[in-house]
Amino acid sequence: MPNPDIRWSVPSDGHTFPIYAGLPSDMDRVGEYSVERDVATIRFGGDTWALQADKGPVMKATTGEATGSQVFTAVGDGKTFGASKNVSCTADRHRVLIHAESRKDFVLFRAPSDPDAPLDLENAEKIGQFTSENGGLKNVHVSFEGAGEKLPLDVQVFLSWVARHAMETRVLSSTWRLSLFLLVLIPFLVLYFLGYI
């Protein structure tokens, strides 16, 4: 059955994000994301995925032994994940490209099965989108359309985790830049108000 939406809700216990799927009017809880003692996991379909993501451009999710210990990957085209304009995701036999249209708006495209084949964004098939506007980081919402609705649920859940990480790394990098700017600006403001400048 096609699934048009994956949503993450605000955690009730402070560290476990419930993950929902389905029509916005009738969503079912399908999994949960948590970070405990610096170990990130997604519990989905009775399985626990081990998640690996840092500042680098590579993310990995390894499913449990019950599902064959599959490795889903997302690789950005920048030095860091937050600086990547395009992220190539491979989950099972499905390939998806996440393209950052702006700092806050992202589009999912169906990628060619050959990883070396170039993707023409003008003619590529759009299969979904997400944004960090209106609390999008806290309440992740990935909307699928067309072929994206027919992706397996585990692939959609993986893409929602990649979406959350893409938004989170951009927020952290912009916060870091703003903090550095303010640290440099403060001495000049103090000197200005004291009349030395």
Per-segment meaning from a language model:
Residues 1-154:
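Cationic, beta-structured binding surfaces that engage anionic biopolymers and membranes
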